[in-house]
């Protein structure tokens, strides 16, 4: 055989082998490039095909893609990372990806500690920069698995060997916290929060009981620097501020409900003090919404897709504060980057009763297309359509049945939707105990929006009802595969 033709014949043979096996998808390198060009690119099917062929790197990347969806089953993602890690013989960074997922999912964090402990013993924790950074990622979630000064030693190695994209601040913060130096830990957490979106949530948790007022003060100190902060950080701060202010609004709602329930009977005109208090509360609500939206609007103006999606959802959820034209213009921006995500926003847009664009049939047609395309949140949207009465009257039983199936498959957003319907849904007998149960599960699985709902119910539910809700939550978590 001519040596010059050997490579060509080899490539032809490989091509025949792929063709013979029926493979027509993208290679892993092509998928990585597609995600580099568009982080929201739909690559799940091609990654699944590669993962099913046993490609460990594809399993890790598939896990990373699914981890960004609220609808993906968290236990399935854990399994992908574990398979990619392959007892330390495969993708070592898959353990870091697993740690990042578990950091956002408290319940899974507790149940997988033993496996992670064993995994740390399956590879040299400081063999090279990649294994060292992986070990430090695990340390962030399970600091108790690193005795003595081991974490500080790994951090020193990381700082010596890291050449690109080095971010030791969050590691330094947790090391200082473990060493009992809270002042140093807070300084490092604040530095981490300026450059790393994960640092924001970690700093918020570090603040403990004073977390809401302390984080608000920190965010306000950063507001003059907003334009120079990474857009991912700006988006995450806006989301956390929205959660904090949402919790405040929930507490104000609970207090108002309690006051109104005590005033049952003949109507009594509110006192000047009550009127002044209600006015102050309304101003507090408005100021909180405006503060969170300033951060979100900055990220939107910089073309950040997750912020554009969040803003569009905010407009759809608050139709009296925005108009249909504003929402459509923003959805058009999303469509230019992610047509499928824009279609999902359109489906929600056409459910809005307050706008003349209301078109439930069009919404249903779009949802049907999304279901046919296996869009992860399509079933959630279908539940929304029934819950809002888009096709007739509100059908909460049908909506709850759809969301229940999604919740059983691991959707955190489905648990949250069920909680909100049981608390304040139309055309259903409200059940605050069930609402508390589902909200706690949602929070356990990383759904931060549930915080406000829980705070509201903490103020209104009797202690016995809360205990019943927590017992039910524990039973459901034992039964569920999440």
Task: Give a label for each model feature.
Residues 30, 34, 64-68, 95-104, ...:
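Hydrophobic face of amphipathic alpha-helices that form TPR/SEL1-like repeat modules
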Residues 2-10:
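Bacterial N-terminal signal peptides that target proteins for export
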Residues 140, 348-354, 368, 375-413, ...:
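Alpha-helical adaptor scaffolds
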Residues 14-71, 133, 164, 246-278, ...:
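N-terminal leader/linker segments that initiate helical-solenoid repeat arrays
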Residues 37, 69-71, 105-106, 145, ...:
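Structural motif corresponding to the intra-repeat A-B loop/turn of tetratricopeptide repeats
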Residues 54-55, 69, 87-91, 125-130, ...:
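Short helix-capping/linker turns of helical repeat alpha-solenoids
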Residues 259, 264, 269, 449-482:
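Terminal, low-structured helical/coil segments at or just beyond the last alpha-helical repeat
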Residues 42-48, 74-85, 109-124, 148-162, ...:
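Alpha-helical repeat scaffolds
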């Amino acid at each position: 055989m001519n040596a010059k033709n050997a490579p060509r014949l080899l490539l032809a043979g490989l091509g025949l082998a792929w063709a013979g096996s029926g493979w027509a998808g993208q290679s892993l390198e092509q998928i990585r490039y597609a995600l580099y060009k568009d982080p929201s690119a739909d690559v799940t099917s091609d990654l699944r095909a590669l993962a099913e062929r046993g490609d460990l790197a594809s399993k890790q990347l598939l896990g990373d893609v699914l981890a960004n969806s609220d609808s993906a089953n968290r236990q399935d993602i854990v399994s992908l990372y574990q398979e990619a890690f392959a007892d330390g013989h495969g993708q070592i960074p898959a353990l870091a990806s697993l740690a990042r997922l578990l950091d956002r999912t408290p319940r899974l964090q507790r149940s997988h500690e033993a496996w992670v402990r064993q995994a740390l013993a399956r590879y040299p924790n400081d063999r090279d920069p990649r294994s060292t950074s992986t070990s430090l990622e695990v340390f962030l979630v399970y600091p108790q698995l690193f005795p003595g000064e081991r974490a500080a030693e790994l951090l020193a190695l990381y700082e010596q060997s890291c050449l690109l994209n080095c971010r030791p601040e969050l590691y330094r913060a947790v090391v200082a916290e473990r060493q009992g130096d809270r002042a140093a830990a807070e300084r490092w957490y604040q530095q981490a929060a300026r450059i790393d979106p994960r640092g924001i949530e970690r700093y918020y948790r570090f603040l403990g009981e004073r977390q809401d007022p302390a984080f608000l003060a920190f965010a306000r100190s950063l507001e003059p620097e907003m334009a120079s902060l990474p857009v991912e950080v700006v988006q995450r701060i806006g989301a956390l501020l929205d959660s904090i202010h949402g919790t405040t609004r929930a507490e104000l709602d609970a207090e108002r409900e309690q006051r109104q329930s005590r005033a049952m009977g003949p109507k009594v005109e509110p006192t000047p003090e009550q009127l002044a208090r209600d006015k102050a509360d309304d101003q507090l609500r408005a100021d909180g919404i405006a503060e969170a939206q300033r951060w979100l609007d900055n990220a939107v103006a910089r073309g950040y897709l997750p912020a554009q999606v969040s803003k569009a959802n905010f407009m759809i959820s608050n139709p009296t504060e925005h108009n249909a034209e504003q929402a459509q213009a923003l959805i058009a921006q999303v469509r230019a980057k992610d047509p499928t995500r824009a279609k999902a926003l359109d489906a929600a847009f056409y459910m809005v009763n307050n706008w003349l664009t209301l078109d439930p049939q069009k919404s249903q047609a779009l949802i049907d297309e999304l279901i046919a395309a296996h869009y992860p949140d399509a079933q959630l949207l279908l539940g929304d359509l029934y819950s809002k009465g888009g096709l007739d009257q509100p059908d909460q039983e049908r909506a709850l049945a759809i969301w229940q199936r999604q919740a059983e498959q691991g959707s955190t957003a489905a648990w949250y939707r069920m909680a909100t319907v049981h608390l304040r849904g139309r055309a259903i007998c409200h059940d605050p105990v069930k609402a508390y149960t589902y909200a706690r599960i949602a929070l356990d699985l990383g759904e931060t929006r549930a915080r406000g709902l829980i705070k509201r119910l903490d103020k209104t539910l009797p202690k016995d009802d809360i205990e019943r809700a927590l017992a039910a939550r524990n039973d459901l978590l034992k039964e569920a595969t999440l």
